[in-house]
């Protein structure tokens, strides 16, 4: 493994350009990837999205700051691709581009896409709903499949459990409004979608299987999950259908909040991060093992400059290409405070009304010091970033992990102070002894 002084390494190798990935422009396609310690990188082009029919493999040229580059003088819209990274002139890893914005079925191969061809009719005319104050947001949490999978949803059978179900109008069950017609009745301002970024554990090629996952097993952070598409083999299909979802909600003055899971990857050594540049994008303990602050086997290293850049670039892409209105960060406390504040600043440049909130806790112990992490008790260091309050939750019902830890409704009157503070929005109340909360 590589033992790096990450701060010095970042100073020497940080890349600040906004052109990593596959970029189409003026009849040519440019590919750039970052891997400073690679001794060779190759671009592999495929005819299909499963990586079975290779067209050609091209060596990439090394530029400054660890960037590898190749330019192809033709429009590759619809062509699939991967990279092969070579280390020490012998170890070779083929993988999807971590910056891929579209992919084939099951997310093993990236796709070059002209996003202008994915816009549904009327996409440019629909305006984002206004939310002038985040405190006014009324958020409805929703899983794409759960929203319409049952026949009682009233959605067309081919749309059940899919992105496009949100665009089906006039749906009812026994005279009662369902799906988007029901959402319109609720008075909500936003729908928070459980993860729609491409995740690992549902086989998109077998839609007839009864498969299900919440989506907290991230695989490709910039690609959409294909199991919610009516045809996952076509990269443009899931993009167009998700835009139809966003458009349908926006037409009814409902914003879209994405649940983002940048804190870990489902795979560790086999992840695209590790295959692109081993031991950089994840946090590593002093003994060389992967730290596990997520409780899922690893945690990403937002304090490393190029992981931070990846998160910022990814969020900027979702906010601009898909007109997303908010981001909910899973296990946000695994990200360092500096990164969280930079993200807020970058989102403000796009739209100050974009919501940003997350979980102010971790799923395990992180090697990064607690005073640098975005824990809820460090919230005074954030600007316009909300946090979930598990204190009020536990004060009402009791502890989450200990069945004998009672809450107020179970007779624990000692929880009253915490409950009162939560009802008041956790605003500091100086007569309260916070050391006992």
What are the residue ranges of the model-derived segments?
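The feature marks proteins involved in alpha-glucan
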Residues: 1-26, 54, 62-168
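Structural beta-strand segments of beta-rich domains
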Residues: 27-31
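Beta-strand signatures of extracellular beta-sandwich domains
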Residues: 42-44
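Substrate-binding/active-site clefts of carbohydrate-active enzymes
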Residues: 145-322, 339-351, 355
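Conserved alpha/beta catalytic core and glycan-binding cleft of carbohydrate-active enzymes
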Residues: 344-437
